[in-house]
From Swiss-Prot:
EC primary class: transferase
The organism's place on the tree of life at top rank: Bacteria
EC number: 2.4.1.250
UniProt keyword annotation of Transferase present: yes
Disulfide bonds: none
Record keyword Disulfide bond present: no
One GO MF term attached to the UniProt entry: acetylglucosaminyltransferase activity
Residues noted as binding Mg(2+) in the record, renumbered to the chain: 303-304, 306, 330
Name the record gives this protein: D-inositol 3-phosphate glycosyltransferase
Subunit-structure text: Homodimer.
A Gene Ontology biological process term: mycothiol biosynthetic process
UniProt keyword annotations, A-Z: Glycosyltransferase, Magnesium, Metal-binding, Transferase
The family this protein is said to belong to: Belongs to the glycosyltransferase group 1 family. MshA subfamily.
Amino acid sequence: MALIRRVALLSLHTSPMEQPGSGDAGGMNVYIRELASALAEAGVEVEIFTRATSASQPAVEHPDPGVCVHNVLAGPTKKIPKEELPGLLHSMVEEIEQIRRRQPHGRYDVIHSHYWVSGIAGLELSELWGVPLVHTMHTMAKVKNLLLESGEQPEPRRREVGEHRIVDGAARLIANTSSEAAELVSHYGADYDRIDIAPPGVDLATFTPAFRTKARRDHGVDPGTFHLLFAGRIQRLKGPQVLVKAAALLRQRRPDIDLRLTILGELSGNKEFNLRKLVADAEMDDVVTQLPPVTAPELAAWFRAADVVVMPSFSESFGLVALEAQACGTPVVATRVGGLSRAIFHGRTGLLVDGHHAADWADAFEALYDDPATRVDMGRAAAIRAQNSGWSRTAAITLESYHAAVDRHVGHLVPAVPVT
């Protein structure tokens, strides 16, 4: 078996150093940073490459022992829409190659790219360096386009074409769940034998069920309040509009419930999506509190302060928030879609809802409100189940994928030309 000493992780469209829940930062950012840290703990040197988005960013950051982040200069040193990144691929690849040449080691054993833009760059670098590419999609254009709401902009054709090229050219593909692996096969014709399934983990030192009473008190949640919590980017795909409608319906049905809804996150994507207006139109201003994203320790405290964490997503490759909330001992109500259907044990650690009808979601909330003993049991079961989901497990599976990629690498890769 080949020895993996050094890995280049590509996350060109968003930095793992960014705050999850803002801009394009979300579960993928957490995934990359935690995976890198766990790989480093396993003895692998990890170098992450991301595009610099501020003139004040240092060229190199060292977030954890054995992990460094290169802020690659390509295009303007500011945040730009993801749609403009393909035009910078050539300059990003050139800059990464220059960084590699300046390194004393001068070589990586594996390239691991995340998201399609990084995958296209990864194909070029794989050919240039003569090392295998391992790729994790995180989201897929064809899957997202199947779930579009009326009036929403579809993912561009060039992304679909790019993802097909990545599937054909990568030595290994890593999926978060078996359902994501099935989507790679059905939508992109991937060879199932080249797919490894590495479920995301959770930071079990941060996301713990301790001090729930203190968390509620610290966040001003009264003992009798039924507290619903949403944490994530504010975009239609994540479904906060479904949650607001369902909470409003629950309030109409059950005026006896002292209801509170906290939304942690910032607007991402379509700037016309106005959550505050939706809240006002539903006459829920006195119930809903919208706050910016918070650090992981504070997020864990918010999870502990909630009775239920809600994820009404239209698509999720995994749904890291669901796992983190359960690790804090809080049941999760989520859409039965993608990785959420596996992250949550329906009836044991939370509830899965089919579709996005507000009445169905209100039914789920009402059922849990009326049965506090079940909520407690679900929370306990959720915390116990999460104990088997540390990042070391994810890193071990990922390392196996790297080994398989290196062992099977024969130097023949699909010619990599940036998609235009």
